[in-house]
């Protein structure tokens, strides 16, 4: 049963209006697509319950579509194949429940390359997922990433790489924006998403500036004054993608980075919606999701 059917069964049209369902959403200015959402954390025992809670929050702040990845258990840095499959199954369940409000990115581990390529085929080529999530198992400049990027490009799937630059040093397999640049230069026709702007966003912005096929994702840090303004100035608004990293962060604090930035409204629309929609549109249309 999908989310709408669940709400109807729980109380009919009145329930839809009362808990942020379709009737209540019609008057909201849905202007954001969120690249970075997790069903790990937050209330609910099942993937369906957790994504339903996320959508109720999204309804309140004007987020139209969620990109889900990683599954219910977040924190296993180098997961074995069985864990990866469980995580992806949880996202598949959440996406089925959410209907047209959510899409999924397949979580892959380059340390298990053969399995990861098969998992990509299961979830993306032969399934409903539309992108790839790479986290901290292996530096993304490693050669094992090349087959994954090529497979994603064949299906026009988005490739998202977590990045950070930690004061105390990154984890053993944790990538930086500089690693993403190395990978991007080996695949100049593929557009890559550099997650979290590297954490240290001033360095992250400069690191990717000259590599035009790398886009900056701004999820998961405090809404610091000047962050988005600098990114627009150095990269152009067409290379920036909004994400929240909910439940790790709130929708509201992350939207505030863009909605409160001193940039034109046209730039805000690109960042909040149009850039991500443009990346996803080819594969979503091919799958009948748009």
Please place each PLM-identified region on the residue numbering:
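Catalytic pocket-lining loop regions of alpha/beta-barrel enzymes
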Residues: 127-131, 138-241, 286-290
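Mid-to-C-terminal alpha-helical segments outside catalytic/metal-binding sites
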Residues: 4-31, 35, 48-65, 121, ...
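Active-site beta-loop-alpha junctions enriched in small/polar residues
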Residues: 38-40, 71-73, 107-111, 135-137, ...
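Active-site gating/metal-coordination segments in enzymes
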Residues: 64-65, 78-167
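Histidine-centered catalytic micro-motifs
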Residues: 32-42, 160-163
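Acidic/histidine-rich helix-loop elements
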Residues: 38-49, 75-82
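Divalent metal-coordination and catalytic microenvironments
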Residues: 36, 104, 132, 152, ...
């Amino acid at each position: 049963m999908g989310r709408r059917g669940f709400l109807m069964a729980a109380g009919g049209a009145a329930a839809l209006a009362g808990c942020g369902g379709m009737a209540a959403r019609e008057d909201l200015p849905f202007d954001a697509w969120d690249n970075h959402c997790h069903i790990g954390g937050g209330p609910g025992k099942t993937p369906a319950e957790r994504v339903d809670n996320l959508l109720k929050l999204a309804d309140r702040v004007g987020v139209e579509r969620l990109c889900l990845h990683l599954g219910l258990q977040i924190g296993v840095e180098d997961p074995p194949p069985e864990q990866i499959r469980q995580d992806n199954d949880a996202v598949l369940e959440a996406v089925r429940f959410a209907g047209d409000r959510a899409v999924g990115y397949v979580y892959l581990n380059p340390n298990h390359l053969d399995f990861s390529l098969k998992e990509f085929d299961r979830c993306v080529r032969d399934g409903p997922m539309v992108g790839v999530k790479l986290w901290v198992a292996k530096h993304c400049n490693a050669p094992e990433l090349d087959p994954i990027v090529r497979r994603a490009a064949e299906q026009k799937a988005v490739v998202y790489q977590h990045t950070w630059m930690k004061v105390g040093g990154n984890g053993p397999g944790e990538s930086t924006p500089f690693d993403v640049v190395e990978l991007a230069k080996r695949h100049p026709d593929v557009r890559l998403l550099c997650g979290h702007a590297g954490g240290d966003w001033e360095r992250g912005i400069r690191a990717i500036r000259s590599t035009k096929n790398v886009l900056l994702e701004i999820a998961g840090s405090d809404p610091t004054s000047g962050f988005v303004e600098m990114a627009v100035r150095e990269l152009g608004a067409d290379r920036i993608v909004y994400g929240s990293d909910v439940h790790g962060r709130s929708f509201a604090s992350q939207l505030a980075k863009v909605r409160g930035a001193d940039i034109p409204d046209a730039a805000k629309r690109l960042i909040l919606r149009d850039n991500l929609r443009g990346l996803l549109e080819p594969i979503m249309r091919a799958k009948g999701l748009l």
